[in-house]
């Protein structure tokens, strides 16, 4: 009976000496019988090392926070979560002000700035997520490639050398090396002086996010919400 290598490598444990010995034996056998399979130019190696394609822009709906029925100046977190909820569960929130229903649930539980409250409300809708304080650009790329948006917390005021503020936006795609976002308050590119719709699909430079998202540009210091839900 032929074995399925998927099952073997799915359960591979590098801390299990038997697993390690088995892989080493497989390598010895390949060298003796099919040495070309272990070359960098081998087709399976090329396929294995190919990074998954990152989609252009995920179709995440846009909800501005500026028309929220209450606390419009401070409900960026709730409107961002509402956008992702409607992406994962289309039809849950009705109409262009659908995030009002979400905001109402948030304030029934706690405060909009409390990330644990957002986690609880999202889970109540059947969308699992977790808030992390150690994300980097590789995490954004991985999630986007899997078809999942990421909510991140940025410094939206001040200069790049001394950023200030605190704001939540939804990363929905990439354009080259830069990131496409839904910013519920408008666009940081115009200093939030234009219409709020400028935040829909706004392109934020990676070089800017390096200092507005990451702590002093250090990798794995970004705040954000990762979703476990499937589209």
Predicted regions and their residues:
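Active-site-adjacent structural segments surrounding the nucleophilic cysteine of cysteine proteases
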Residues: 2-111, 175, 195, 200-201
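Noncatalytic regulatory segments and standalone regulatory/sensor domains
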Residues: 43, 52, 56-58, 108, ...
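Ordered hydrophobic segments in well-structured contexts
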Residues: 46, 149-153, 168-170, 222-229
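Extracytoplasmic/secreted proteins, especially bacterial periplasmic and envelope-associated proteins
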Residues: 75, 79-83, 116-124, 139, ...
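Structured segments of extracytoplasmic/periplasmic soluble domains
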Residues: 83-91, 124-128, 143
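Catalytic cysteine-centered active-site loop
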Residues: 93-139
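Active-site-adjacent substructure of cysteine-protease-like catalytic cores
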Residues: 132-190
């Amino acid at each position: 009976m032929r074995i399925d290598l998927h099952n073997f490598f799915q359960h591979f444990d590098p801390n299990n000496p038997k697993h390690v010995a088995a892989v080493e034996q497989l390598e010895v056998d390949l060298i003796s019988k099919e040495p070309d399979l272990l070359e960098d130019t081998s087709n399976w190696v090329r396929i294995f090392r190919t990074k998954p394609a990152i989609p252009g822009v995920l179709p995440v709906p846009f909800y501005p926070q500026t028309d929220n029925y209450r606390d419009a100046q401070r409900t960026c977190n709730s409107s961002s979560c509402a956008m992702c909820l409607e992406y994962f569960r289309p039809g849950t929130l009705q109409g262009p002000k659908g995030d009002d229903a979400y905001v109402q649930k948030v304030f029934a539980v706690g405060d909009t700035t409390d990330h644990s409250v957002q986690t609880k409300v999202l889970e109540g809708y059947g969308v699992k997520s977790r808030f992390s304080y150690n994300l980097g650009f590789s995490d954004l790329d991985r999630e986007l490639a899997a078809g999942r948006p990421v909510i991140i917390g940025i410094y939206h005021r001040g200069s790049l050398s001394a950023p200030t503020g605190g704001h939540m936006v939804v990363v929905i795609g990439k354009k080259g090396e830069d990131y496409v976002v839904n910013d519920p308050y408008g666009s940081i590119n115009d200093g939030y002086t234009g219409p709020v719709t400028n935040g829909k699909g706004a392109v934020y430079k990676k070089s800017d996010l390096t200092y507005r998202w990451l702590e002093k540009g250090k990798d794995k210091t970004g705040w954000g919400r990762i979703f476990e839900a499937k589209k």
